[in-house]
Amino acid sequence: MRLSEQDNPAFFRRKSDRELQFVERLNLAISEFPVLSNEGYTWPVRIFTLGRFTLLHRDQPLDYGRKVPHRPLVFLKTLIALGGRDISSSSLTSALWPEADGDNAQRSFDTTLYRLRKMFGDDQILILKDGKVSLDPRHCWVDVWTFERLLGNVQRIRSKDATGKDAYKLEQLMQHSLSLYQDHFLAKEDMTSWSVSLRERLRSKFIYNLLDVGRYWEMHGFWDKAILCYQKGLEVDDLIEVFYQRLMQCHLETRRISEGMAVYRRCRQILSIVLGLQPEPETESIYQSLKKARQQKQSA
């Protein structure tokens, strides 16, 4: 991805100082937009937040020593939850030290930022400029950033492709997003005021994409791919009835009647136990179609 002298030594020897400066600026511009995947590029720091929080330094779990640095890690999680880039110190202090007065909050901010930088052992990871904090994407990979870019690319393909010509590209993007979304944002930790917004936004985006791409697969007859989308949707939230409906319909289309009826029974049980509700008329209608198909199969 980066231009280097090893790629073409003669090219570099012929360049003037001005041209070399241009190449350096080009390298910087390229590095500001790393590839979506974390494969093929080694970030000094990689942060996983979709599920269990994991922090890797040079592809190894960061060694905290004898005591886990609780406050710096909370600072880092809060920074990511607020967007990770150009977050004002006042936003961070309000989230982390809401009861502290201005001076005490600022001292806590300065101390915690120092400890976090020391923990990384690299000042390039965290940038403080004009009172705003950023994780440098040239040196730090965050799963949430990649996940949201993936979903954005999925939607761009969906908005342009009505023929199925980009099915392979779409499948690759969805497989990558499925592998990243192990669970909700910081799911293993207590929900806080600063984490709930991002958690719900990512969850809603993912659910929307699973439904949308599932419909795309149905439209083009890729029933098994649609089934995978809807099954993942139920893993994310098993109270969303439309996932049951579409899953039942896919099993009906592929003549997997037993599987479709099992989905209905699960839907009925979950809705009754958790919400005290009965399935919607559309769910019941698909169930009746499954029953009819079973009867036809038995009488054939």
Question: Where are the regions a protein language model picked out?
Answer:
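Intrinsically disordered, charged and Pro/Gly-enriched terminal/linker segments
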Residues: 1-5, 15-16, 64-73, 81-84, ...
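Short boundary/linker motifs that mark transitions into or out of structured domains
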Residues: 3-73, 123-134, 183
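Short capping segments at the starts of secondary-structure elements
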Residues: 79-92
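Short, charge-rich, low-complexity alpha-helical interaction segments
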Residues: 118, 122-123, 211, 215
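DNA-recognition element of transcription regulators
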Residues: 52, 67-77, 96, 102-121
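Conserved RecA-like P-loop NTPase ATPase core
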Residues: 55, 76, 92, 116, ...
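Active-site-flanking beta-strand signature of metal-NTP-handling nucleotidyl enzymes
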Residues: 48, 77, 147
